[in-house]
Amino acid sequence: RVIDSKGCRDIGKLTEVEKSLDRERGIFVIRNKLRNSAGRRKLGVLWLVLDPVAMSLVYLFVLTVVRSYPGIESLFIGISMFRILQASFMTGVNSIQDFTGGLISERVRSRVLVSAALRYRVLETTFQSSAISVILLFGLGVNLRAVLAFIILSQIMGILAEGVGLNMSKLVRRIPDLSNLIRYFMLLMFFGSPALYPMATTTGLHYKINEYNPFSYFVESVRYLADLESVIFNL
């Protein structure tokens, strides 16, 4: 086994026993991540499902009070997709703080950790998008094509965001103060991105900046397929 700055790996072919152990380790890592997400909360993993719904309802109330109501479908799509983006990115940033994957007795192969991280990202994103998908389809009458696009694009966006965060994780581990700057940046990005409102409502420099914002392409695509106000073909 070789452990260096590039990761933890073995030279040569793995035996069937080692492959079986890697699969079991991967499953353990995923379960450990779910336990960490649940914490000591009684609803546990269910909060992954409820969080996007709760946040959407909070901002729906706030925007209704200030008379800046963008449409409930557009708001639910925007906020839930940004929550997925944010969670995925921050998971990637914090991903290499622990090379054991929760297995204290040894360091797990990097391949196992990456595979487990990918599967967990798909699982968590499925949890996060499930309740919103049901609300969009059955509660708000959004067409099935748009709901499927919402689920698929959320998965793709989540994987890409975690990958970007993973690439930044070594730098953040070396300079811990960057984690605070990243949190401020994500907060700024939340209010600056077309999450609370369609991009069509932005003008000037605000619109121009969002043309270079990857999130805009994902969320505006879903809004277009949902027959909502969208500028996807102008980007």
Regions found by a protein language model. Give the residues of each.
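Hydrophobic transmembrane alpha-helices and immediately adjacent juxtamembrane helices
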Residues: R1-L235
